[in-house]
From Swiss-Prot:
Gene symbol of the encoding locus: Nat8b
InterPro entries xrefs: Acyl_CoA_acyltransferase, GNAT_dom, NAT_camello-type
EC number(s) from the headed UniProt entry: 2.3.1.-
Domain of life: Eukaryota
Single GO term (MF): L-lysine N-acetyltransferase activity, acting on acetyl phosphate as donor
Source species: Rattus norvegicus (Rat)
Membrane topology label: Single-pass type II membrane protein
Listed CDD domains: NAT_SF (cd04301)
Protein name, per record: N-acetyltransferase 8B
Gene3D superfamilies recorded: 3.40.630.30
Length: 222
């Protein structure tokens, strides 16, 4: 097994961090496309368009050709939520990681390195308006490069955030992830996180039928 270590982010890591984060998000486009194709409303759309064309033109061939033309549009639709998410992050908190995550003692950003290469990332920021009596830290951007999965890196990064939160006196660590990221949800639940809710963050996510799951880890002493 390849060795790795976790350390605090440095500005020299930026390009590698963006690469790991972007690839980690966009790798869900194919599975989102398959998920979208199997949604009842998508199947009804494809069937409805096909039948309408057959009734109007009398040609099944035209109907089949039309479906093949619709598939690229559905692929585009499946990719838009992920691309928009990446773009939003790169223009907000990840535009300047040092400023966003390392300018305050209550936040942090870490990378996992293997052979002097960044292979994993995770960040954490305090929740601005936590529930009364709670001090919450939100976990962001957990990602591990595809070549280095199955080595416990993601779990180690989450543990780094949990230990940081405990040391800083937080009562909870919260996060959001999508229902499409099954491996991530399984990881969090296995580490003691609890589901607290789910929702569609935008109309685009609703169109592709993917919800965001909200999870919470409360420290026993809290």
């Amino acid at each position: 097994m390849v060795s790795y270590h976790i350390c605090e982010y440095q500005d020299s890591d930026y390009k590698s961090v963006v690469d790991v984060f972007t690839k980690g998000a966009e790798e869900y486009i194919p599975s989102t496309f398959r998920h979208l194709l199997l949604l009842p409303r998508t199947l009804l759309l494809l069937l409805g368009v096909s039948l309408a064309l057959v009734l109007v033109s009398g040609s099944w061939l035209l109907a089949v050709v039309c479906i093949f033309f619709l598939l690229p549009f559905l692929w585009f639709l499946a990719g838009q939520p992920w691309k928009n998410y990446v773009s939003k992050c790169l223009h907000t908190d990840m535009a300047d990681i040092t400023k966003s995550y390392l300018s305050d003692r209550g936040s942090g950003f870490w990378v996992a390195e293997s052979g002097e290469q960044v292979v994993g990332t995770v960040g954490a920021l305090p929740v601005k308006e936590p529930p009364s009596g709670r001090k919450q830290l939100q976990l962001f951007h957990l990602a591990v490069s595809s070549q280095h999965r199955g080595q416990g890196i993601a779990k180690a990064l989450v543990r780094t955030v949990l230990q940081f939160a405990r040391d800083q006196g937080y009562t909870d660590v919260v996060l959001e992830t999508s229902t499409m990221q099954i491996g991530a949800v399984t990881l969090y639940l296995g580490m003691g996180f609890q589901k607290t809710g789910q929702y569609f963050p935008s109309m685009l996510w609703r169109l592709v039928g993917i919800r965001f799951v909200q999870l919470n880890y409360s420290f026993p002493s809290a």
